Amino acid sequence: MASSREIGRRAGWVPRAAAAAIMVAATTAAPADAKTLRWAHSNDATTMDPYGAYIPVNASLLNNIYEPLVRYDRGYRFEASLATEWTRLAPDRWRLVLRRGVTFHDGNPFDSGDVVASLKRASDPNSPYRPATQMIKDVVAIDDHTIEIQLQGPYPTILNDLAGVYIMDRQWMEKNDTLRAVNPAKGEESFATRNANGTGPFRLTSRRPDVETVLEVNPAWWDKAEHNLERIVYRPLGADATRIAALLSGEVHLVTPAPVQDVDRIRRTPELKILEVADLKVALFGLNIGAAQLNDSDVKDRNPLADRRVRQALYQAIDREAITGRLLRGLTKPTHALIAAEIQGFDPVLDTAPAPFDPEAAKRLLAEAGYPDGFRIGFDCPTERFVNGEQMCQAVVAMWARIGVKAAYQSHPYAPYLKKVLNGQSDIYILGWANTPQLDAFSILNNVLHSKTPRSGTWNPGKYANAEVDALIDRAGSEVDPVARKALIVDAFRKVQADYAAIPLYREPLLYGARRTVETWAAPDSKIRLWLTRMN
């Protein structure tokens, strides 16, 4: 039996990510509206429904309105939120004691019925959040402030999953006919799409999609407020120049993200500052390994990527130092690991290069594989979602050309890009994986590196398959001993590295621009925690 106290001690498997996150002190006088934070982001949240879609912009806004049962502290260790205690009764069963005296923004009291209804809604087959709850077999309310969760089997990361599921108000859902989840990807909406009622530190008071969202402080919040904010005005400003102009003029106090090309300008402006941290998201290239034939290649009788030597050649031809030093202006560093150091399961050995940057060695590998003159191959990148992503992809095209690989580069808006990739129509593609909201290596292992099954390989359009890797991932998915589990995870990643099944590049740089009056935590999961934000 494991208690919350025991789990807290075991949380040493997570390095102190707080050392990488930054608290920036205020240095100038406060403006007249010191308690109103004006925040501009590059795009708008797609929905106010906490189970509508897990994308960073949604999570960054909604984590201030809704709360989970357990949350992460600044070191990415579990701490109490709407649950104050959690106990593992058996490898497949947990008991959670809920916080008393909590109310939703409309005044309804929080109790176990809300948790049962929320987990049922998140588990709905139509819910985009179903993957986070698929291991939950049943949830039972023992009393008003105690629940028990029965799992499908032994499962070590249920707390990680629960940390990403926000709790909704059962009475509010019943009243507004939104007990059943809707899927925005199918064009579906419900009352929860444009309205919200959580227990969090701020409540939604106004919502105009793609124009402005207004939050106001929740005076009845159960936790101790570290912020001094009364009101937040959130505006989507898509154009980089517009966003930075608003920051320079004082129209907004915080911009997320700050464009790489404007970092020096912001730093030179006395009233402004840059908050920077390495994102949890690792930028990597996915490879169409399992197809019989590539989509866009002059090799028609076989798939060059099916040969490990070809994959290694592509790996060794990339000058990561040049990419991070020049294109990304030294704001991040190369990585050879597929997960960030803050992610559960990371080991420093995973950031060891399986082979060095060596174009001449890459040419020899191609010749050994039967391609002394190289070959043509399709290569797709999105026009958005990655910092200087198009420039990086074009730089890699030039690097591969030096070894004879002619990458037929195409850039696409993100939506058609994603459709092409997931349909298996791309030979090489860029993917960013942050392992959120789970913050566990099982996320990328099971979703990206496991072969396709009903529960695995959702993001493996390249059809990479290794029976030994699959077996290790499956065992890690049910191993509850943390030491044994980490060994399985590291072993799986080492085999993936030896296969060159994916090509990690770097952790994305996460950059915020702010007035010097703003003090906040630049967290590597890219969420703005308004309850940890002050204006001075």
Regions found by a protein language model. Name each.
Residues 38, 111-118, 144-150, 200-201, ...:
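Alpha-helical secondary-structure segments
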Residues 40-90, 120, 131, 195-201:
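N-terminal lobe/hinge region of extracytoplasmic solute-binding protein
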Residues 77, 165-227, 231-233, 360, ...:
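Gly/Pro-rich hinge or "lid" segments in bacterial periplasmic/extracellular proteins
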Residues 87, 131-181:
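Surface-exposed binding/hinge segments that line
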Residues 95, 308-312, 316, 324, ...:
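Extracytoplasmic/peripheral linker and loop segments enriched in polar/acidic and small residues
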Residues 190, 219-265, 308, 397, ...:
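Ligand-site clamp/hinge motif
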Residues 316, 333-368, 386-390:
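Structural transition elements
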Residues 512-536:
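Long beta-strand-rich cores associated with HINT superfamily self-processing modules
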